[in-house]
């Protein structure tokens, strides 16, 4: 766990350094695939039909998250919009994850991505600890 923490700190320092030098790595340049795949395993074990309350699909996306993605797209003057049915589509679920990261995680913090996916943008570290550890365990494999 110490090694993982050091790795994440190093990534965050590098991202912060890049941001101050004007070389900000955009979310599109960050390879979020391993993080998304680990989240998918924790959330649904890869079942695109998974459902728990209002959360559905491989990434257990809520209607509120779909609405937030559409608000972001609207602010970006994009005509694209997501539907509630898109939560069952693996590729579109990953697109929504990436869109959220691009806005709410500009430094591409892996820890922030994992914790906020579980606890929202104003997550509490203590409440997201078990989830974070589950995802990190899969990332280490």
What is the predicted function of each stretch?
Residues 1-12:
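Bacterial N-terminal signal peptides
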């Amino acid at each position: 766990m110490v090694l993982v923490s050091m790795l994440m700190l190093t990534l965050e320092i590098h991202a912060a350094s890049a941001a101050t030098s004007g070389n900000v790595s955009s979310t599109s340049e960050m390879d979020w695939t391993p993080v998304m795949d680990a989240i998918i395993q924790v959330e649904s074990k890869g079942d695109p039909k998974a459902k728990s309350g209002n959360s559905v699909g491989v990434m257990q996306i809520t209607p509120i998250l779909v609405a937030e993605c559409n608000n972001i797209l609207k602010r970006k003057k994009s005509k694209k919009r997501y539907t509630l049915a898109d939560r069952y589509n693996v590729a579109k679920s990953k697109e929504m994850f990436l869109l959220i990261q691009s806005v709410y995680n500009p430094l591409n913090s892996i820890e922030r991505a994992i914790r906020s996916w579980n606890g929202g943008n104003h997550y509490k570290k203590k409440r997201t600890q078990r989830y974070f550890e589950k995802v990190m365990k899969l990332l280490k494999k």
